[in-house]
Amino acid sequence: MSKFNRIHLVVLDSVGIGAAPDANNFVNAGVPDGASDTLGHISKTVGLNVPNMAKIGLGNIPRETPLKTVAAESNPTGYATKLEEVSLGKDTMTGHWEIMGLNITEPFDTFWNGFPEEILTKIEEFSGRKVIREANKPYSGTAVIYDFGPRQMETGELIIYTSADPVLQIAAHEDIIPLDELYRICEYARSITLERPALLGRIIARPYVGEPGNFTRTANRRDLAVSPFFPTVLDKLNEAGIDTYAVGKINDIFNGAGINHDMGHNKSNSHGIDTLLKTMGLAEFEKGFSFTNLVDFDALYGHRRNAHGYRDCLHEFDERLPEIIAAMRENDLLLITADHGNDPTYAGTDHTREYIPLLAYSPAFKGNGLIPVGHFADISATVADNFGVETAMIGESFLDKLV
């Protein structure tokens, strides 16, 4: 019999809590990640007021220096710790896959200086369209169409860009490059990026409409991902007939593997929380696992090194946390964590190699306190333990610590 009928895992994308032990093996603009600290530096430089996460125990998580504006609770309402990454990567897919029990020993490739000429030339030859070379770099999806959409409307050239994650994205105005053609080009790009030196996690079609200065990305986005190389705990749950619900980009990250209810993409963190609340309220969701990703911290503020915006985004989540707690049933478990760091005060614009926080709350808790520091995959091991299924590759359950 399951200890908890339902477990809700919420990933605050990029909300790290201090440099990992191996952080100096990872760099940002040539600077090792060893001094990175997403929550610590936000708290120190612009202040952080997250009373609802603090009540659960955010300020109790062991650190060399306590979070400056998040006090430890003498009697928290839940359990807290921090978790270390084992896998050799600091991207979204690696973090999420490890959370679900995989050890990624060969990380995906990322292209901070843009894609090599060989890839662009192959796409040009296949499509019969030129590629705008100036867009070939890590770019905001809205900024890239603002900057190059007018040119695409005039010339029909392809807008190909990337991000901090191992993705190749192709933006195309629907009136200039029809959807069927865009999808066909993306399928070709997928076929040539399945092995090194260009092993990419996703190819993303990014269609848009409108006029210069007023472009809008449409819902016709399409992700061509790769499935995890080994069954995750999501697969184990699915095989056991236990419902799994994905909110936000979770379904894309796992290429649908092990997920039987995709609740759709988020338009924003707030929209994602709305979707989570809707999911939690489903009458048919009596037992199972929901997995939510809230990406605005990372996409809108971390990469853009906007500490004030990042702080405000954390405040907005914290203000809505009571709604999530109110939607919980007596035997629900809520786990709040992250997938990597992205210190908005740090060098460069890439993710940072950090510990991730873990907060655990349930209305059924009789106790509280700290869980021993562990690893990302301990989350999935705990989920597996609760529902009586096998773990994946790695992870140690902390279920017995939650009382």
Curated annotation (Swiss-Prot):
GO terms for biological process: 2-deoxyribose 1-phosphate catabolic process; 5-phosphoribose 1-diphosphate biosynthetic process; metabolic compound salvage; nucleotide metabolic process. Its cofactor is Mn(2+). It is found in: Cytoplasm. Its main location: cytoplasm. One of its GO terms (cellular component) is cytosol. It comes from the Bacteria. The keyword Manganese applies. Isomerase that catalyzes the conversion of deoxy-ribose 1-phosphate (dRib-1-P) and ribose 1-phosphate (Rib-1-P) to deoxy-ribose 5-phosphate (dRib-5-P) and ribose 5-phosphate (Rib-5-P), respectively. Belongs to the phosphopentomutase family. This is Phosphopentomutase. It comes from Streptococcus pneumoniae serotype 4 (strain ATCC BAA-334 / TIGR4). The lineage of its organism: Bacteria, Bacillati, Bacillota, Bacilli, Lactobacillales.
